[in-house]
Amino acid sequence: MSCFSITGAIKNYAWGSRDYIKSLLSIESHGPLAEYWLGTHFLGEAKTEDGILLSEKIGHRLSFLFKVLAISTPLAIQCHPSKSQAQEGYLKESLLSLDDEERNYPDDSEKTEVVIALSDFTALYGFLPLEGIKENLSSFVPELFGKIKDSSSIKEVLETISNLSTEESRKILSQLEEKTGNTPPLSFTLGPKELCALCLSLYSDDIWCISPLLMNVVNLKANESLFIKPGIVHAYCRGNCLELMSSSDNMTRLGLTKRHVDEREFLKIAYLDSTPSLFLEAMETEEGAFSYSYKEAPFSLIRYEKGIHTLPRIKDGIIFSIEGKAILKKEDEEIEVGKGEAYYVGEDDKMMIEAQGSIFFAYGDCL
């Protein structure tokens, strides 16, 4: 059976949760744990039980990166590049080291993402129609509305905000705080007002605290999903999720972060038009599994909850248990996968999985 245990790479960013990944992986930690990477990206590669890098074990790199995210405070307003944008940006930054904090492009790959909620989950996704933006700004920050009321595009609005003086920004943020407060909301269902208050509680001098007035607020329940194409502006705000993406760590940030921000590059690659949320509905298979796939994504994901299923025949895949256990079977061989455990699955015929819980199978190309 071409299948073996792997351990992912943990990222301890400040926005992470102090309990979710710790509990999922049954590990000790005294600080926030934000992400758990399962893949072969050089900035955080999975390893086998004996410490060998996954790419060395299998002789190539995966076409996808599979992550767990545990979010206690909002991530940066961000977007990811297309293939051509990534290649151009990577070349432009060639004099910087690959782990330099100033880099937007640590690799030359496009970045498409699918996010699957594991709990109640809130995100900002794409821009509202221009009239919706103007209506929100008129209600919450008349000072800013007066400056953008004649704008004919979302790009004009963003450029106006980007060019505000420090004093102008201070007045607008003060007006926003009067309307929304700056206390983190206790409710898990968040709207624009609550998200502005949350952002102000963390980044009180960042003009992009107004972002929830410009963007779609999306609240997902567990197992609901969003598809994020290159260029789509987004920010995850609160909750736990799985993220399946092209094997890339490229991003440009607009604000709401202490990490590197590049407004000029962001406005260059972002899709600056209104964007309806692309919900990705899981399709139930004949065997009772749930498939997440999108024709523009170079990867797929299946959720198994119970029963016995035939795994698709693939080049590379990763099985990961969020809850419960699974048994991988081939002829007389069996491997048990417990909560928080991950297994690499290579090219193999007629492998079966018996699931009891919430088991996810991420994979790239089918054979």
What are these model-predicted stretches?
Residues 46-62, 126-127, 202-221, 312-314, ...:
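A short beta-strand-loop-beta hairpin characteristic of the jelly-roll/cupin
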Residues 300-314:
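Conserved short histidine dyad/triad with adjacent acidic residue
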